[in-house]
């Protein structure tokens, strides 16, 4: 049974080719935003960074959570998130910085996965069906 999300629209068949590393000025944290390759952001997901390792230069964050309204009033089911993540793994795999829509040198997706069960990373609870990603960022300025 599909859960209702107040005033939100379901995203289906998302084709995601970029993941951006961006700053959110209000709280000075980095977030991930997903968008279409054609340069038009068809939806944004301000996922939280759940782990950062300065030694390996790896940043792990939530790309999209199931049944959670995003910043544009949209949501995705677990099944649609899985489809989008698999499409990204096969066709996307690009990282940019600050919505530039230009592939970022020195940033590589090293891991992308769907949570198979609820679990914890530090103090963060990750819900089953959440799309997570680890990006290696070689640029110390980022």
State what each model feature region is.
Residues 1-142:
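Signature of dsDNA virion morphogenesis modules
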């Amino acid at each position: 049974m599909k859960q209702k999300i107040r005033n939100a629209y379901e995203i289906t068949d998302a084709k995601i080719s970029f993941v951006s590393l961006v700053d959110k000025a209000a709280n000075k944290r980095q977030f991930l935003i997903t968008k279409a390759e054609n340069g038009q952001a068809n939806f944004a997901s301000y996922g939280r960074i759940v782990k950062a390792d300065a030694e390996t230069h790896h940043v792990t964050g939530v790309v999209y959570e199931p049944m959670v309204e995003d910043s544009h009033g949209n949501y995705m089911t677990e099944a649609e998130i899985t489809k989008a993540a698999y499409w990204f793994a096969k066709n996307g795999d690009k990282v940019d910085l600050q919505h530039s829509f230009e592939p970022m040198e020195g940033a590589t997706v090293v891991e992308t996965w769907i949570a198979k069960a609820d679990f914890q990373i530090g103090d963060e609870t990750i819900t089953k069906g959440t799309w997570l990603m680890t990006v290696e960022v070689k640029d110390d300025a980022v």
